[in-house]
Each structure stands twice: as C-alpha cells, then as structure tokens.
Amino acid sequence: MDGRTLGLWLLPPVVGGIIGYFTNDLAIRMLFRPYRPVVIGGWQLPFTPGLIPANQGRLARRIADAILGSLLTPDALHDLARRLLELPRLEAAIAWLVSLLLERLREVRDPRSIEVAADVLRDLAGSALPRWLRAIVRQRQGLDAQIDRWFEQQLLSQKLGPLQAQQLGDWLLEGAFPPDQIRRVMLDFLTDDNIRNLDRIVRDRTRGTDWVIANLFGVQSSLQRLRQFLREQPEAGDAVIAELSQRLALRQQLSQALQTFQLTDLPQTTLTDLRLQLRQGLRQWLDQDGLSLLEGALGGLDWTAAARALLDRLRTAVISDEAIAAFRHEVALILDQRLEHELEDLVAAALPILALEDLIIGRVEATPAADLEAAIQGIVRSELQAIVNIGGVLGVLLGCVQSLINVWSLST
C-alpha cells in the first residue's frame, strides 16, 4: 500500500475527528467573536460584532422571560419564602432582634433618645391601642370567652374581707336601707288588705295557747296601731327601728354573712343571667365609653417620664433566658399564623418591588461578552463534555465513510 492510498484511508477520519471535536468550541467562538464592530474605511464588516454581542439586549430579555416563566414563578417564590420563614428561622431572627434591642437600650442615656422613645410610645398608644380595643369589641366570641374566663376564675371565687364586709354592711344599713326607708317600706306593706290577711293567717296557723290568744285578740288591731304610730310619729318610728337594729346586732350579723357569701351560693340560673348581663354590660361600655376613656387616660400621660422609666427599667432589669425564649416563641407563632394566610399576598406585592426582570436584564446587559463566552465555555467543558466527545466520534465515523468512498472511487 503506497502513501497515497494510506492517506486516503487515514486522513479523512483524522480530519473529521478533529473538526467534530472542536466544532462546539468553534461555534461558541463564532457566536461571540468579534466582541466589537470591525470598521474598515468607514464600512462595518458584516457579522461584526458577533451574534450574541450584537443582540445582547434581546438575549437578556429572553433569558429573563425564561427564568421568570419557568424557574422563578410566583409559586416557586412563595415556596422559597415559606422555607425561609419557617418557625425556627423566625424564632432565631426574633431572638437576634431582641438581643440587639436590649444591648441598644442599655446604651441609651441621652435626652434625644428618650424623646424618640416617648414619641414611639405616644404613637403606638394613640394608634395601636384604640385599634386593638375596637378589634376586641368586634370579636364577639373572643371577648365573651375572656369575660366568662374572668367571671369563673376570679369573680366566683372572691370573698369579702372583714373590713370590706363591714363597709358594705354599713352602706346597706345607712345608705340603702336607713331607718326612714325601712319605715316607709313598712307603711307601704301595712295596707288594710295585708293586715286582714296577716290576721287570718295568724288565726289559722297558731296552735295551743297562742291559738286562744290569736282568736280572742288577733293581730289586726296591733298592726293598725303600729301603722298609725309609724305614720303620725316618723321620727320616733325611725328611732325605734334604729334601736331595734342595734339590739338585734344586725350590723355584725350582716358583716359576718357578707364575709361567708360567694356568688357560687346563688342558683345556677341566677349565675347564668348574671354572666349574660356582665357580657352585655362590658361590651356596651367598651363600645360606647371605652374608647373615649382610653383616649382621655392616654392624653393625660407624661410620655417623656414614661419613656425614661421604661428605659431605666429595661437597662437595670435582669431578663431570664426562659422569658426571652417564651417571648420569641409566642411572637414567632403569631407571625407564622399571619404568614400562613397572608404570605401569598405579600409575595405578590413584593414582586413588583423586587423588579426581578429588570434586575436580570440589567445584569446580563452589563456582563461583558468575553465573560459570557467564558461562562458558556466552562459549562460546555464541565457539564457537556459528552457532547464534545460525541462530536469527535461522529467526525471520525464520517471520515471513515469518506475514506471508503475515496477508496471505492479509486478502485472503479
């Protein structure tokens, strides 16, 4: 076999393998090179700059559309935000904020910082507390549950102390039911019909010696004389009632009865009615007068003194790790519950602010063509090396076919 025949056999596979192997690299270079327009004699050569540098703006927009349309979709961003805002991460962020806040508060001593803290407290109390009060009034079930819990845990188990029972007993005997009021009640009760009914009851229900006295004398005349005495001599009647109250030790007996009294002694129906009336009364008071009372109370506060006292307290207070952990856990739970319902809306509102499309377009347009080429070449060499190898193999195969064609042509 001479050299010419050997060349016909070997040269096409070698050349085809070289071309197939380096085609990808050559194609990528042809897409990017030259990076700038080539101008000769005032005339720009065709296909300069390369295809990608000449259309880098349109390429950037297509890349942005592809990324936002298939990769960074709203659902994908929602899932990403949900993973980023998991409960442990929220707790860690809140713990960091609390520690930072405590460190800063311990350093705050100048009057300007105190004024700023006072303004914050004033704004917070002036806006947040009224909204919180209105929200409580609107949430009927939540407010009723709180009132019922307070009623059952606090009010039902309360007892009056000796001093409180004495003061309440004095008020009942002197303010609510003084001797003059008792005398008027007795006069209203001792009507002719009531006197006759009392006399008949006494006659019917007495036995033994009392029956003889009741049926011979009765109580009608005695009650009529008592009524006449109370009506004609009011001052003397009041004195008799006061003396009788003192002799019977009503004040001491009433005080002892009040000390042992609890609301649980009342019938269940009465307690139910009392609970309903308490709910309605508190809700009506909060709705009508609570807001004005709160605003009036807040308006009279010295916010500067309150801020100074709060900062001094925070500066000198020793806050345990357990309290901080409980606080951050509760706040994280509240945020997690709110995010569970509002995260989708927050992500939708954040997308226009982030302007991801403009960001991607700007980054692609600002990247030099040489850097884009190097990045694509690196991807091809590291991730798509199999394609390069297949190109070389295909080149060798096509070269072998060409060698067979050449040899067949010579033989014919």
Curated annotation (Swiss-Prot):
Q: Which GO terms describe its cellular component?
A: plasma membrane
- InterPro entries annotated for this entry? DUF445, UCP032178
Q: Which residues cross the membrane?
A: 8-28, 390-410
Query: What coarse category fits the chief subcellular location reported for this protein?
Result: membrane
Q: Where in the cell is it found?
A: Cell inner membrane
Q: Does this UniProt record's set of keywords contain Transcription?
A: no
| Alphabetized PANTHER family for the sequence | UPF0754 MEMBRANE PROTEIN YHEB
In Swiss-Prot or TrEMBL terms, this protein is called UPF0754 membrane protein syc0451_d
